[in-house]
Curated annotation (Swiss-Prot):
Free-text domain note: The Clp repeat (R) domain probably functions as a substrate-discriminating domain, recruiting aggregated proteins to the ClpB hexamer and/or stabilizing bound proteins. The NBD2 domain is responsible for oligomerization, whereas the NBD1 domain stabilizes the hexamer probably in an ATP-dependent manner. The movement of the coiled-coil domain is essential for ClpB ability to rescue proteins from an aggregated state, probably by pulling apart large aggregated proteins, which are bound between the coiled-coils motifs of adjacent ClpB subunits in the functional hexamer.
Molecular function GO terms recorded: ATP binding; ATP hydrolysis activity
Chain residue ranges for the region called Repeat 2: 83-146
GO biological process: cellular response to heat; protein refolding
Function description: Part of a stress-induced multi-chaperone system, it is involved in the recovery of the cell from heat-induced damage, in cooperation with DnaK, DnaJ and GrpE. Acts before DnaK, in the processing of protein aggregates. Protein binding stimulates the ATPase activity; ATP hydrolysis unfolds the denatured protein aggregates, which probably helps expose new hydrophobic binding sites on the surface of ClpB-bound aggregates, contributing to the solubilization and refolding of denatured protein aggregates by DnaK.
Residues that bind ATP 2: 605-612
SUPFAM superfamilies per record: Double Clp-N motif (SSF81923), P-loop containing nucleoside triphosphate hydrolases (SSF52540)
Pfam families: AAA, AAA_2, AAA_lid_9, Clp_N, ClpB_D2-small
Annotated Gene Ontology cellular component terms: cytoplasm
Segments for region (Repeat 1): 6-71
Protein's name according to its UniProt entry: Chaperone protein ClpB
Length: 857
């Protein structure tokens, strides 16, 4: 008996039978061993065949186990087992049956056919289970679908549709698909193309996230509900699973074999199946090796003959890149374009999906949350499409609330972490004996007592609220199941079941749900069970960094006092501070133009008067950190070709994949302060790029992606006209100086550039009083740095006047002051600290003696 005459599945089963015999210490491989191996085999034909014959497989397994238990055990056979006489006869019988059926290879289902006529123990067992040769013959013909066994992998490629596709109509019947709201025109156009005589293959094209796959799911639901023309009724929509088709195809030709078997089975279905290929472009080039044919070319003949009813889905870019290049494949498909839905349509879609998400997360989603998700995602998430980005917001907001219910609330979690931190510190300090450590230990013990009491109270409240919330979850799940059963009964025409559900169970569950919801209505302090617009805004703020959440009282006060905050670091520039503060307030109050940046400013003035410092202060005010400022030194963009660095190199140039310096920074952090320092030093072509940013708040980078600048503050600084300011300071008022400077600026910048800037602010030169104020700020920073080293520095008024006078230079602004502080204070202090003259913990006085700065302790 030659093993290579068997199919690969049958060969594997024989080897598995041999292992089974060895494991049980049997000397011979009996038919029962092979039968058990065939039943246990993954993807075998035997199990579906026996299921078709109404055989109880678990009963068969237990009876086979009994047969094997009665076989004699032989120890010490050294791992050698042989085929028994019965087994040899059965395999020869299988060979005869294969020849009779004109098969090139012997397949595993013939073993059952041979065994049922056998007079051995397996034959008797099969007869007892009600099997006959005629019944098995009939089932084999059905499984094979009229095909002969022509190659060794024939069994693996059988029932290819079951293995390599997902039945969407079946999932629609079971209620596993999300409802499809709207998209009637696109579904109607898809049905229209499917009804054609030839080229009846629609390809659904649209941006990622607009709902292409949902259209096919909507078609499957309509077929199930009978809401389609007569020509499409009772058809099945099968989704091709490319992953399963390619996975495990190790040898050349194996992938093509699988695809061919799928196409053969589809042609046998005679048009009763619509094949859906998601990501259609993956078919072009799939399985293409050296000289072999790819999947796209294998589909062409079936598509042209109309044997294959196919619906494809792909994005615009991939359609252009893969399918349009292959004109022969493209002409076999008819395009159905899917546009992004409007905000109103998205709200309708979200209302339809609401119940599914409520059921999954066991939370309630309010209508304001749905409206906020659609509107806010449309405005602030510019690089993705509706409805996908709005659904994401709803999903994540519901998930965060569910997480807070299931795990500890954030406030409780923070308290617990703080308690652990204090306990660790307590343990460490208990080993120290010095006075400072003991003082800190007492403070920690007091704080620990307070925190532990607070934690115990909060935990009690949390447990009570959690118990109250779990009431409605069970009722909601039951109600959803009852509605699904109602739909199944409606399709089956079971009127008794329908009336029982519609007038009995469903109203009763709805009543229970209302009562449970009323019990939940009392205000909860820790847990929430509702997704509101505030949660949506919070999730969006976390995703994009743009503050769209409702302002808390503290933030309102902070914005109203914004000038005072900025004046703490920027001295003597009232106009500039006011202009910037007003722009930020307009934005946070929601009054700024949604299609332009929050504010764009051109800061003009001499060096060292606080132009760059104001930008840093603004970034610090808005984000609590100067790191969120995108600083671009325009002196680096003096050559014409350096413009490409801002938006990214064009295709074909080195660095094309890397993206632009400005565009990438804003894509990653859409809410930021952009400082274009020394803007007049840049090449004039740079300003042409800035025109779109200042007017429309958008810029297209080197890769064709639109970058959104609508949530940025753009500040450009320049020294233009600073000589005029110095000459006329004191002679003219602010307006007069401003007009003179703008005259110089208009000669340098184009009118269309100046016209797009929201406000041009001219900075004042700094006077003696301003310099003194700045000196006190900078010395205060030095005092704080020394405090960290345990030195207490006190600066006398006379010393402050001395430094301010030494650092005053009307031409260079505040920068000479920094040098004066270094020269007169920091350098002598550093020397005295290093030489050991100054001791820690004792006060140090900085004062004037004989017109010199001296330190005394």
């Amino acid at each position: 008996m030659r093993l290579d005459r068997f199919t690969s599945k049958f060969q594997m089963a024989i080897f598995d039978g041999q292992s089974l015999a060895l494991g049980r210490d049997h000397q011979y491989i009996e038919p029962a061993h092979l039968m058990v191996a065939l039943l246990n085999q993954d993807g075998s034909t035997i199990r579906p065949l026996l299921t078709m014959l109404n055989v109880d497989i678990s009963q068969l397994r237990s009876r086979l186990g009994e047969l094997l238990d009665h076989l004699p055990k032989v120890t010490g056979i050294g791992g050698e087992v042989q085929l028994s006489n019965d087994m040899g006869l059965l395999l020869n019988m299988c060979d005869k049956l294969a020849q009779k059926r004109k098969d090139k290879f012997i397949s595993s289902e013939l073993f059952i056919l041979a065994a049922v006529d056998d007079k051995g123990s397996l034959g008797k067992l099969l007869k007892e289970l009600g099997l006959t040769a005629a019944k098995i013959e009939q089932a084999i013909n059905q499984v094979r679908g009229g095909q002969k066994v022509d190659d060794q992998n024939a069994e693996e490629n059988r029932q290819a549709l079951e293995k390599f596709t997902i039945d969407l109509t079946e999932r629609a019947e079971q209620g596993k698909l999300d409802p499809v709201i709207g998209r009637d025109d696109e579904i109607r156009r898809t049905i229209q193309v499917l009804q054609r005589r030839t080229k009846n293959n629609p390809v659904i094209i649209g941006q990622p996230g607009v709902g292409k796959t949902a259209i096919v799911e909507g078609l499957a639901q309509r077929i199930v509900n009978g809401e389609v023309p007569e020509g499409l009724r009772h058809k099945r929509v099968l989704s091709l699973d490319m992953g399963s088709l390619i996975a495990g195809a190790k040898y050349r030709g194996e992938f093509e074999e699988r695809l061919k078997s799928v196409l053969n089975e589809l042609s046998q279905e005679e048009g009763s199946v619509i094949l859906f290929i998601d990501e259609l472009h993956t078919m072009v080039g799939a399985g293409k090796g050296e000289g072999s044919m790819d999947a796209g070319n294998m589909l062409k003949p079936a598509l042209a003959r109309g044997e294959l009813h196919c619906v494809g889905a792909t994005t615009l870019d991939e359609y252009r890149q893969y399918i349009e290049k292959d004109a022969a494949l493209e002409r076999r498909f008819q395009k159905v374009l899917v546009d992004e839905p409007t905000v109103e349509d998205t709200i309708a879609i979200l209302r339809g999906l609401k119940e599914r998400y409520e059921l999954h997360h066991h939370v309630e989603i309010t209508d304001p949350a749905i409206v906020a998700a659609a509107r806010l995602s449309h405005r602030y998430v510019s690089d993705r499409q509706l409805p996908d980005k709005a659904i994401d917001l709803i999903d994540e907001a519901a998930s965060s609330i569910r997480m807070q219910i299931d795990s500890k609330p954030e406030s409780l979690d923070r308290l617990e972490r703080r308690i652990i931190q204090l306990k660790i510190e307590q343990q460490a300090l208990s080993k120290e004996s010095d006075a400072a450590s003991q003082k800190r230990l007492n403070d920690i013990c007091e704080e620990l007592d307070v925190k532990e009491r607070e934690y115990a109270e909060l935990e009690e409240v949390w447990n009570a609220e959690k118990a109250a919330l779990s009431g409605t979850q069970h009722i909601k799940s039951e109600l959803e199941q009852a509605r699904m059963n109602m739909e199944v009964a409606r399709r089956a025409g079971d009127l008794n079941r329908m009336s029982e559900l519609q007038y009995g169970k469903i109203p009763e569950l709805e009543k229970q749900l209302d009562l449970a919801a009323q019990a939940e209505m009392q205000e909860m302090s820790l847990l929430k069970n509702k997704v509101t617009d505030a949660e949506i805004a919070e999730v969006l703020s976390k995703q994009t960094g743009i503050p769209v959440a409702k302002m808390l009282e503290g933030e309102r006060d902070k914005l109203l006092r914004m000038e005072d905050e900025l004046h703490q670091r920027v001295i003597g520039q009232n106009e500039a501070v006011e202009a910037v503060a007003n722009a930020i307030r307009r934005s946070r109050a929601g009054l700024s133009d949604p299609n332009r940046p929050i504010g764009s400013f051109l800061f003009l003035g001499p060096t060292g008067v606080g132009k760059t410092e104001l930008c840093k202060t603004l970034a610090n005010f808005m984000f609590d950190s100067e790191d969120n400022m995108v600083r671009i030194d325009m002196s680096e963009f003096m050559e014409k070709h350096s413009v490409a660095r801002l938006v990214g190199a064009p295709p074909g140039y080195v660095g094309y994949e890397e993206g632009g310096y400005l565009t990438e920074a804003v894509r990653r952090r859409p809410y930021s302060v952009i400082l274009l320092d020394e803007v007049e030093k840049a090449h004039p072509d740079v300003f042409n790029i800035l025109l779109q940013v200042l007017d429309d708040g958008r810029l297209t980078d080197g890769q064709g992606r639109t970058v959104d600048f609508r949530n940025t503050v753009i500040i450009m600084t320049s020294n233009l006209g600073s000589d005029r300011i110095q000459e006329n300071f004191g002679n003219l008022n602010y307006e007069g100086i401003k007009n003179m400077v703008l005259e110089v600026v208009s000669q340098y910048f184009r009118p269309e550039f100046i016209n797009r800037v929201d406000e041009t602010v001219v900075f004042h030169p700094l006077g003696q009083e301003n310099i003194k104020h700045i000196a006190s700020i900078q010395i205060e920073r030095l005092v704080n740095r020394l405090k960290e080293k345990d030195y207490e520095l006190t600066v006398q008024e006379s010393a402050l006047d001395f430094v301010a006078k030494a650092g005053f230079d009307p031409v260079y602004g505040a920068r000479p002051l920094k040098r004066a502080i270094q020269q007169y204070i920091e350098n002598p202090l550093a020397q005295e600290i290093l030489s050991g003259k100054l001791e820690t913990g004792k006060p140090i006085d900085l004062l004037i003696e004989d017109e010199h700065l001296v330190t005394k302790q």
